[in-house]
Amino acid sequence: IGKSVPLVDANWKMTGQAQYGDDIRLPGELIGKILRSPHHYAKIKSIDTSIAEAMDGVFAVATGQDSVNKFGVLPVTKDEHAMAQETVRHVGDLVACVCAIDEATAIDAMNSILVEYEVLESIHDMEDGLKDSEHPIHDRGKYHIGESNVQKRVFQQFGDLDSMAAAPYSHEADWETAGLHHGFTEPHAVVAHWDPSGRVTVWSP
């Protein structure tokens, strides 16, 4: 505390020597690619993967129906899926994935998947998203409060809140800020290896 600490991996990153998941190459590896939604909000009417499945060099094709188990980025709320089940909720939502012998084959297979959508009215204004809705974008689970499109509200409490009453100054206000992605240097990729004993090694990002 109170001292400048050298960033131990700065030189590796600045000189391009840092190793990320996408730099890892394993013997006999397979390449996966993900098909993503071009729509903000839509129902998935059908997915035809037959062309991709019949292609030489394609080992597997999967959709949301193959990944029905739920998880939670916030572990207390396990209400998310690895891929869209019946509805896509943003541009880039995961629809299907392929596993192939190389990247070119995986991309060709991914692009051959035919998806029929029913495009729904999307919300692009925060104030509109807070209004009550008969048809919420997200399923209403036990953490969904009220009738709005707020996906979930989780209340957590930290510190001594009572001490704020004795604070000499206080300020309350509303703030708005745009979504901001961190300035990453690594590609979004992951490499996994299962050895004969069943041990899994994962390189990410």
Protein language model annotation of sequence segments:
Residues 1-205:
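Structural alpha/beta core scaffold segments of enzyme domains
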